[in-house]
Structure formats: structure tokens, C-alpha cells
């Protein structure tokens, strides 16, 4: 028996080397047969890109953006440039840099998006960094941040429409930042195109040399190949020194479920790699870099980012709190804090339009809060404050740069986060000047002083005005002036910058501008007008708080500060619309709109009525009157003590657009 056991042990020990040898030879072979090709597919392009980038000095970097009026072809031109450089396949996608669903649905750019490109010019590789910027005035903050990453810009003008209001605004914004501007005339293939008129407008309005302009069709690709050599020759390379301590600007950020907060950064000096320890100047918090890379066009990991580049980083452990990522913040390596001067950052945009947002189901409040915080991480121009309503429960007071900004944010909440929300109509801030000299900005109508307080303690009420620039064909001049005058506007200037195009400037109350002014303007000009505006200070105004009362009890979710000229119209609209959504009660329901102590409109909902005369003889008049009086008295008592039951869906329907 013992001999058998020894034989087994000997055989086992004898077999082990061969087994381990066989397994060691077979196992790597199995690894190579499965994972190596997959790694080759993923890593080979990245390594080729990285090798090419490593060989390019900063003198052959070019950072540029495309700026234009909305719908002049920025995103389509971006697609053609990405195809030309081989970053994407030709015809593989449309509007690659319009990544949000709402951008594709509306056909506008909302978020400034970035992409790095490699381009060989005269035998030398160049690293080009492209930023596709929004055109609408509501997203001006996105445009301003984009300029911090760029040394120049392609100023794009539609050959059929010419210079528009936001072309002018974006030009002066880029000019103020010191960007080198390259004029580009787009859509020259259209039958209605007039490139010479657009060139003349650029020369007369911006003093840009027509000889330096490039005439293209982004849709067909005509002359697009001439753009990149022009960018290389005319736009300067970024300035930076990779041997200096790291100095890195946070340009944008977004949230990933697995990576935490991802930062889009522009390196002014130094280098950054995975594993580096960095510190924020704004918060003092320290982080370990988990990965660095470029957008090509999606996230493409790199071993290093150098001075002059724009790329992304995320940390390990991840940055989980969105409040830590402050756009405009400067980062450097731990230990270099005293050697680095922080960058100036960005001017904080001021919210101009405010709404209240409530979840349809009160139990969804935590989900709504989390969704809003994630969106604000990607859009820092939104302001946020918690508030509550007796009618609608817990919610938020949100501030935006304009009504389109608000509408897009609402769409993103619904599409990207599945939020079911109730949004109140947009309002603007108002200024209260108290008799003791203090000034207060009111953004929530519920906090507006009551009538007695206004008389006793307030010196003056003011509302914000804007300077609106409107461009449109000359034939609609009369209609546009009439529209502006009916909205309490004051004309400032009128000029013809071509024989048929007009630039009209009006000072308008911001409250009128957010009340679908742009929609009315489009209607008056058959869609040919464009609008841009900027702040124009505060003015004294005759304003009051309009409230909705149900049986003399104010409904806190429905109140608004309006000019005296709007009180009657809005009051009548409110009571008639609210009446449609309130169910009948056992007693009469009175719906009123009141400005201060003055009731400006009223509607009544008749109660359910029981036929108390059903069993009476037709000739019994005395008994008939007695029963009707008794029913009437009973209703009065019920009305005095009863509460009106208003369903949550009634508010939802009333506040719906």
C-alpha cells in the first residue's frame, strides 16, 4: 500500500513540470488568439495619433473656432473639416459635434463642442483644435468660454442672407478677445446666394479685407479644402512652454456615471500625465489624474497633454461633487502653487429669465434635484435655488440667460433624465429701492412686497431694459417699428447697411422681450428678421404683482410681476384659462385676478345643485321659497368653512404652454 502511494506521489511530481509547461505554453497562446487582435484594433490608431502628435512642436498647433449667426452652417462646415482631415469617414455622420438630442431636433448648436484634427500641410503635420460654437444670443457664455481656448476664428456668413444681428455681436465679442478673424462666405451654391454683397458687408461693417475671404459651400464641400491652409497661414500658434510648471484652465465639464466629473482643459504651460497630483486654485482640493486625452472626435486616451493643447482629464479617485468643478479655475501640480500665477478665468454670466420647476410627482424631487445638478455641471450659466409652494410642493427657482436657454434646459431634463416636471411661465428680475436707501433684486414674484409695504417703505420700483439690435429687409420696417412701440420700446437708431437691409436698435423692457417677442418679430417679417440684445440698465417702472385668487385665497404658484399696461389683459387670460381646469364643488368657486387690492378679472364656477323641489306640489309656492332659501343658506355656510379642492393636474394644465 505504502509503495502504491509513493508511486502515485512520484508520478504526480513527475507530471507537474510537463503540465505546468504545457499550461504555460498553451495559456499565452490562448490569450494571443483572443485579446491581441482586439487590442490591436483599439490601441493601434490611438498610438499612431499619439506618435504623430508627439512629433509636432507647439509652433505647428492651431486652435480656432467657428462663429456665426444661428443657422449659417457652422456644424455642417465642422463636419466637412473633420472629413477632410480623416478624423471621421466621409458621410458617416451629420453634425458630429452636435451631440445633444435637443441640438439635432432643433437644428441649432447649444453646447460648444471640441475636436482635435491632424492635417499634413506642405509635408509637415499640424495639430488643429476646432471648436463649434452656438450662434444664439442665449448661449453667449458658451461662445465666450470657447474663445479662451482659441487664437483665431472663422467668421462665417450666409451668402444668401448676409450679415445678421448675431454675426455683429459675435464679431465684436471675438474682436474684444483679440482673435484673428478669417472671413468665410458659406452657401455660395444656393440660387439666391450673393457672395459679393456679403463681402461688401464684411468690408463696410467689420473692415475685413475681402481678398482674405474664402468662398465655400459646406453642404457640397466646394472650396472647403482651401480653409485649412488659410487657418495655418493666418491664425497664430498658441503661446506656451512645456518646460514650465503646469498651468491649466478648466474650460468645461460634464458628468459620467463611471468616471465621475470629466474636465475639458486648455494647457497654457507644462505637461500633464496620468498619475500626476494636481491642485485647484479655487478650492484648494488635490486630485490624482486617472486619464488624459483628446477629443478625436470622441474621448481618445493619450499618455501626455502638452502646453498649447486642449483635451480632457478625469481623476482617480473620481471627482464626484459637481460643485468642485468651477469653470474658469486654474490647476497646477502639487508643490508648484507658489510658482504659478492663476489665470483670470471667466466673467460670471447674469441670469436674465427665471422660472420655477416642480416635479409632477412629489416623490420624484430627489431625482429632479440630481438631474438638475448634473445638467448645471455642463451649463454653469444656470442659477439654482430651492423653493416650495403650497400648491405644488418642493421645487426649484432656476435662472437662465434667455427664453431659448430655458426651453433647451427643460428639453434636456425631459430627454436625458426622463424628468416629469411643471415649469412656470418665465419672469424677469425687478429692483426694489427702499426708503432707507437699500436696493434689493427680486427674482421670485412671491417675495414681491405687498401693497401696504410698497406704500409705507418703498421709494421706487425698477425693471431691466435691453438694447435690442434687429436686422431685417427694408420692406418690413413699418411693421417692426409698430411691434417695438406696442411693446413699450424706445427707438435709438436706424441705419441701412445695404440698399435693402435695415439695422434697427430699440431699448425694450426685458419683460416684453421674454413674452414671445421674437416669435412676434418673425411673424411680422415672415421669418426674415434676426435679433440680438445686450443689457441696458434699470429704469423706473409702474409695476405690480398680479395674483390669482380662488375664493379670495391667493394661489402661491400663480403670481407674476407685470407692468400696469399688461394687468387687464393677463388677468382676464388667467381667470378664463384656470376656470377650464378646476372641477365643480358643492359650493360656488370664485376665481379672481388681483393687482394689489384691485380685482381686475373674475370668473365663477357654479356649484352642484340638488333638486330640493322634486317632491313638492306645483301650487305650494311658500314651501318652495322656504326650501330654496334653506339650500342657499347651507351653501353660504359650506363656502365659508369649506376648502376648494384643486387637483394637481389642474395646475399642470394651467401652466402648460
UniProtKB/Swiss-Prot annotation:
Whichever gene encodes this chain, its name is: GUF1
Q: What is this protein called?
A: Translation factor GUF1, mitochondrial
Residues that, per the record, bind GTP? 121-128, 185-189, 239-242
Subcellular location per UniProt equals: Mitochondrion inner membrane
Q: Keywords assigned by UniProt? A: GTP-binding, Hydrolase, Membrane, Mitochondrion, Mitochondrion inner membrane, Nucleotide-binding, Protein biosynthesis, Transit peptide
- Identify the species of origin: Ajellomyces capsulatus (strain H143) (Darling's disease fungus)
Instruction: Give one GO term, molecular function aspect.
Output: GTP binding
Q: Which domain of life is it from?
A: Eukaryota
Q: What is its EC number?
A: 3.6.5.-
The similarity comment for this entry is: Belongs to the TRAFAC class translation factor GTPase superfamily. Classic translation factor GTPase family. LepA subfamily.
